[in-house]
C-alpha cells in the first residue's frame, strides 16, 4: 500500500492531467478531442450571441449596400442572422488582424468567418470525442459514424459550397430567415429539387421520421405490464434490468399482419441498425449533393422536353419549376447585377469610330 501511494505522489503533473482528461469517471468526458472542442465551440457560441445582438450591417455583396442582421439594428428573432462575409473578401482568410480596424472587420462580415470556422472545427472534434469515449468504454464506433452525417451537411453548406462558388458570401447565413433565403437561392441557381442526391436526402429524413414513429409506437404498444392500472407503465422499468421491457414477438406479429410478413424485422439488432443507417445515409447523400452543386454540377434540366407534332412546347412540372427558378433568381442580389446573367454573358457588339 505504501508503494502505491509513493508511486501516485511521484507521478508528474502532466501524467495526472492526462489521466484526468482521459478519465471515464468524470461527470462529463473531456478527452483529447474535447481539449480542442471546448474552446472552439465556446468561441463560436460567444461570438454568435454577441454578433446576433449587436453586429453592425455587413456589405455582403461588396457593392456598398450593407445588410442588417442583428437585433439592435432592427431585426427580430425570425429575421435576424449573422450576415456572411463580404464578396469583397471572397475566400480570403479574414481574421481581425487582417483588417485595418475592427469597424472595417465588422463591415466586411468578419464574425461570420470566425464563427463558421470555429464551429466546424468544434463539431468535428465533438465527433472525434464520441469515438474516443466509445473506444475508452469498449463500445463500437457507430455513434460517431452516425454523427458524421450532420457534420458533413454543415461542412457542405458552410465551407464546401463557398469554396465552389468562390466566396464566403455565398455561405448559408446564420439565422432562420437567412436559412430560408439560402434554400430559395440554392434552388434558383442549382435546381436542387431535381437532383437525385437531394431526393435521397428527403427520403432519408422523412423515412427516418416515419420509421422512428413506427418503432416507438410498436414498442410502446407491446410493453410487458409490470404495474397496476393506477400506475404509469413507465414505472415498470428499472435501468439495467435483465428482463425484456417489451414483447418483440408481439410487435413482429402485429406489423407482419398489418403489412406483410417480411416487412417486419425479427432481429432487434438489425432493426436498430436499419433505424440508424436510413437517415444517416440519406443525409450523407444530401451533403454530397450540395458539394457537387457547389461546383455547378446541378440538378436535372427537363425544360421544354415535351413537344407536340408541330414542335410546340407542352409544359410539364419541370417547366413550372424552371419558371419559378427564374423568378427567384432575378429577385436575388437584384442590385448587384445590371443585367440577368444570361444576357451579361453575351459579348457586346463592337463599334467602329
Curated annotation (Swiss-Prot):
The gene is psbA. Keywords: Acetylation, Calcium, Chlorophyll, Chloroplast, Chromophore, Electron transport, Herbicide resistance, Iron, Magnesium, Manganese, Membrane, Metal-binding, Oxidoreductase, Phosphoprotein, Photosynthesis, Photosystem II, Plastid, Thylakoid, Transmembrane, Transmembrane helix, Transport. Chlorophyll a PD1 binds at residue 198. Tyr-161 forms a radical intermediate that is referred to as redox-active TyrZ, YZ or Y-Z. C-terminally processed by CTPA; processing is essential to allow assembly of the oxygen-evolving complex and thus photosynthetic growth. Its main location: plastid. This is Photosystem II protein D1. The lineage of its organism: Eukaryota, Viridiplantae, Streptophyta, Embryophyta, Tracheophyta. The keyword Plastid applies. GO terms for molecular function: chlorophyll binding; electron transporter, transferring electrons within the cyclic electron transport pathway of photosynthesis activity; iron ion binding; oxidoreductase activity, acting on diphenols and related substances as donors, oxygen as acceptor; oxygen evolving activity.
Amino acid at each position: 500500500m505504501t508503494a502505491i501511494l509513493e508511486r501516485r505522489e511521484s507521478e508528474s503533473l502532466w501524467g495526472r492531467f492526462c489521466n484526468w482528461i482521459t478519465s471515464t469517471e468524470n461527470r462529463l468526458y473531456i478527452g483529447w478531442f474535447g481539449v480542442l472542442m471546448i474552446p472552439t465551440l465556446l468561441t463560436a457560441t460567444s461570438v454568435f450571441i454577441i454578433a446576433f445582438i449587436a453586429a453592425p450591417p455587413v456589405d455582403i455583396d461588396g457593392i456598398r449596400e450593407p445588410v442588417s442582421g442583428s437585433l439592435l439594428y432592427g431585426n427580430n428573432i425570425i429575421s435576424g442572422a449573422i450576415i456572411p462575409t463580404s464578396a469583397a473578401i471572397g475566400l480570403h482568410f479574414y481574421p481581425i488582424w487582417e483588417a485595418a480596424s475592427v469597424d472595417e472587420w465588422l463591415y466586411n462580415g468578419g464574425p461570420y468567418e470566425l464563427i463558421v470556422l470555429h464551429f466546424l472545427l468544434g463539431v468535428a472534434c465533438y465527433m472525434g470525442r464520441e469515438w474516443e469515449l466509445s473506444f475508452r468504454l469498449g463500445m463500437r464506433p457507430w455513434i460517431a459514424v452516425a454523427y458524421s452525417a450532420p457534420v458533413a451537411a454543415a461542412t457542405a453548406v458552410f465551407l464546401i459550397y463557398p469554396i465552389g462558388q468562390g466566396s464566403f458570401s455565398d455561405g448559408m447565413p446564420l439565422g432562420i430567415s437567412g436559412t430560408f433565403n439560402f434554400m430559395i437561392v440554392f434552388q434558383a441557381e442549382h435546381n436542387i429539387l431535381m437532383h437525385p442526391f437531394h431526393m435521397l436526402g428527403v427520403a432519408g429524413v422523412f423515412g427516418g421520421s416515419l420509421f422512428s414513429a413506427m418503432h416507438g409506437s410498436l414498442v410502446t404498444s407491446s410493453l410487458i405490464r409490470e404495474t397496476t392500472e393506477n400506475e404509469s407503465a413507465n414505472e415498470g422499468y428499472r435501468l439495467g434490468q435483465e428482463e425484456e421491457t417489451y414483447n418483440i414477438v408481439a410487435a413482429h406479429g402485429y406489423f407482419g399482419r398489418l403489412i406483410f410478413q417480411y416487412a417486419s424485422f425479427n432481429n432487434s439488432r438489425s432493426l436498430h441498425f436499419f433505424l440508424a443507417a436510413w437517415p444517416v445515409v440519406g443525409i450523407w447523400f444530401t451533403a454530397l449533393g450540395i458539394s457537387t452543386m457547389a461546383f455547378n454540377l446541378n440538378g436535372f434540366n427537363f425544360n421544354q422536353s415535351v413537344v407536340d407534332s408541330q414542335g410546340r412546347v407542352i409544359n410539364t412540372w419541370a417547366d413550372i419549376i424552371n419558371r419559378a427558378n427564374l423568378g427567384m433568381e432575378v429577385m436575388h442580389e437584384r442590385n448587384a447585377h445590371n443585367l440577368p446573367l444570361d444576357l451579361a454573358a453575351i459579348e457586346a457588339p463592337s463599334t467602329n469610330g
